[in-house]
């Protein structure tokens, strides 16, 4: 049997591409060696958020006296939390399997090896197809630090498939993965230390967002060490000893476990036969604007692509565009606007350009800020301080980017993503009526702040 498209990898990019290809009339096969859903569903986004949601409910129970409620003897059962995590993952994974079957995608289990254009080996069988789409994803990358092979040195994969809770956790890397685990473990009462090599946590995000979260984390008791270069990890009498250099001094932290969250690398090892040269660059696959590799008929999307944004929703959008073009359709997704989120408390989200990026591009940029502490729903829920900062063109008022640190930021950022994609101005955004009292009102207020017309905040 032959197919018009063979998709390698069943993560968000791969299964989305396979389903859309089938919807567009292409005979499609999906090859996945493990469970469908990839890292995101099985060992990433979904299990992390399931645990974070539980930890936040635990925090809220301890703070319930604010609302006139009393809850005595509040505790948590981490094994039970992990059991629910696994139930959530299983439910969503089963849903993906049903969608693949319902859309008549042929699901093939096994490890794929590309033998050449149109030929993929899976076990003893050789599949034939008109086109091949690689959606192989990525895996945790470990830096060359002595001692990272010791028991108790873990990756996010390890933490999200086990059910052991560590009272002392050292985290190497202050990016999104590192900070989400820091927030999770802090909420459950652990001693958390974050070691970030650069000068601030979340270095790819807006500096004000990064600095604000840093202050909040420190206030909650998380030890943050920026500019820290980890030199080695050793087994000590009381746990793992992580030695790091900061400001010409050598310091140590002792922990029950060390999480290495220093980035990810493409899953391309052994993907192709030697005669199939995709021109890999540090393991990543170069592609053109149609996601075509240097080999005709072989395409690639998602984390395995050189320079790609390593986000599940970005991979899914790339997959939709790639197969749409293969089917002779116009690509429907705007890949220039990709929101990113950090699930901490309060939540963080970013989309479009930051003020600094606008200035680097020579844009006459202005910013407006709305403090969410004056939002009615935020006061009702005791959400605390937060803000929304909007970057816009100082001449036209066109919205260029938004940075959010507030309750429900990960939901609110979608409205800004839509506005940026459509080329909307502050006036366009301010024209929309939001229900009251809602967190979403803050979006309109942020736009009004840029116009100098905010109602619930003094205009400056």
Model-derived features: positions:
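Flexible, glycine-rich terminal cap/loop adjacent to redox cofactors
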Residues: 8-13, 17-34, 39, 46, ...
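Glycine-rich flavin
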Residues: 2-3, 19-26, 31-165, 193, ...
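A Rossmann-like FAD-binding core segment of flavoenzymes
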Residues: 106-109, 113-121, 188-289, 353, ...
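Core beta-strand elements of the Rossmann-like FAD/NAD(P) dinucleotide-binding domain
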Residues: 1-3, 123-131, 248-257, 294
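Hydrophobic "anchor" residues
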Residues: 47, 120, 266, 293, ...
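FAD-site-proximal beta/loop scaffold in flavoenzymes
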Residues: 149-167, 252-325
